């Protein structure tokens, strides 16, 4: 079985697609913000999905998204640039200030999204974006112990201070090195992890992880 992270580029999107991301991220530094989310943070998020698949972990899909966001946040707190994390957190907070909260009064976050998971109601930029951005900020707020997160995912955790730091520029071109360093760090802990490749797509709306035979 092989694993692949497919990630679209902002710069190859249509004018309409780019305009949509400008509306989401703002007109200033849209390219950087897109890359910060999708080619820095989200590479580790999608890696989390691959790792759960490798470990044959089958959990509720909403819980899986929450777990891989906790994994990505925890990873970057140990292996990332703290300035990037601050920029990332600030960016998410700014976006959520303008994205309407769709959760009905009296319903919990996870309860609501479990009720609409897999439906057309979820498949809008505003709805799914609210879910993902909110769950990332929730992971930042909870600040779970990274070793506990790895254990929950069925992975070994070694000396966190020995992790290799990633400090390259945030660009689409560096997405492969983001993944390479993360795999190196996880293998350093004694985890046997299959190779994972990155495939770039012209469509910036395509962001996912696939496993194939």
Which sequence ranges carry the predicted segments?
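Active-site scaffold of zinc-dependent metalloenzymes
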Residues: 1-35, 50
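Short, flexible helix-coil linker/hinge segments at the edges of structured domains or between repeats
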Residues: 13-24, 92-101, 105
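Soluble non-cytosolic domains of exported or imported proteins
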Residues: 30-38, 42, 58-62, 66
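Active-site recognition of the HExxH zinc-binding catalytic motif
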Residues: 41-54, 65, 69, 73
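Generic structural signal for hydrophobic core residues of well-folded globular domains
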Residues: 47, 51, 75-76, 116, ...
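Structural signature of transmembrane alpha-helix termini at the membrane-water interface
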Residues: 51-54, 79, 197
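Post-HExxH zinc-binding segment in Zn-dependent metallohydrolases
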Residues: 62-96
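Pan-zinc metallopeptidase signature
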Residues: 103-213
């Amino acid at each position: 079985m092989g694993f692949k992270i497919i990630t679209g580029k902002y710069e190859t999107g249509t004018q309409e697609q780019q305009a949509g991301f400008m509306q989401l991220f703002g007109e200033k530094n849209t390219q950087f913000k897109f890359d910060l989310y999708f080619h820095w943070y989200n590479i580790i998020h999608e890696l989390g999905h691959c790792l759960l698949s490798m470990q044959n972990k089958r959990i509720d899909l909403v819980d899986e998204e929450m777990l891989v966001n906790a994994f990505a946040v925890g990873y970057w707190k140990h292996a990332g640039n703290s300035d990037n994390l601050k920029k990332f957190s600030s960016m998410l907070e700014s976006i959520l200030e303008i994205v309407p909260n769709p959760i009905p009064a009296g319903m919990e976050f996870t309860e609501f999204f479990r009720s609409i998971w897999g439906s057309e109601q979820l498949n809008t930029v505003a709805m799914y974006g609210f879910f993902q951005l909110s769950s990332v900020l929730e992971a930042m707020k909870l600040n779970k112990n990274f070793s506990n997160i790895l254990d929950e995912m069925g992975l070994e955790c070694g000396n966190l201070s020995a992790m290799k730091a990633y400090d390259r520029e945030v660009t689409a071109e560096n997405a492969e090195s983001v993944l390479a360093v993360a795999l190196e760090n996880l293998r350093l802990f004694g985890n046997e992890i299959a190779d994972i490749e990155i495939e770039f797509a012209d469509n910036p709306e395509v962001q996912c992880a696939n496993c194939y035979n």
